Regions:
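Bacterial N-terminal signal peptides that target proteins for export
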Residues: 1-8
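Solvent-exposed, flexible loop/coil residues
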Residues: 5, 33-36, 41
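Bacterial N-terminal signal peptides
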Residues: 9-16
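Short, flexible active-site loop motifs that bind/organize anionic cofactors or intermediates
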Residues: 13, 24-27
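Sec/Tat signal peptide C-region and signal peptidase I cleavage site
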Residues: 18-23
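Compact alpha-helical subdomains of small soluble proteins
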Residues: 26-27, 40-100
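Acidic/histidine-rich, surface-exposed loop or edge segments in extracytoplasmic proteins
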Residues: 30-35, 56
Length: 100
């Protein structure tokens, strides 16, 4: 009985100390469609919009984030993407906001 208790205790300790393995997911944002963006098929639109904002801000050497404008732009992009599901989301950004 004491061997079983010791074994179970050791097993619980071992399992408790093992960190959960997290899968690393790689995305090619240039291939995300509006359908995937607006349909929450990859992640939330906000997460993708934050990345897009950083990407285009970096191209302009802009280090400031206007959080209100980011939210408004995300909603504008979502509305556009709902109406144009087959377009790539980066092309949608370039069409709506004139980014290149």
């Amino acid at each position: 009985m004491t061997k079983a208790v010791g074994f179970v205790s050791a097993l619980i300790f071992a399992l408790a100390t093992v960190s959960a393995a997290r899968a690393q997911v790689m995305l090619d944002v240039s291939k995300i469609t509006c359908d995937q963006f607006a349909g929450y098929k990859i992640t939330t639109p906000q997460n993708i919009a934050i990345w897009l904002n950083g990407y285009y801000s970096g191209k302009r050497s802009n280090t400031v984030i206007d959080m209100q404008k980011l939210g408004e732009n995300t909603k504008t992009l979502e509305r556009y993407c709902i109406q144009n599901p087959q377009i790539l989301v980066m092309n949608a950004v370039e069409t709506i906001f004139g980014e290149k």
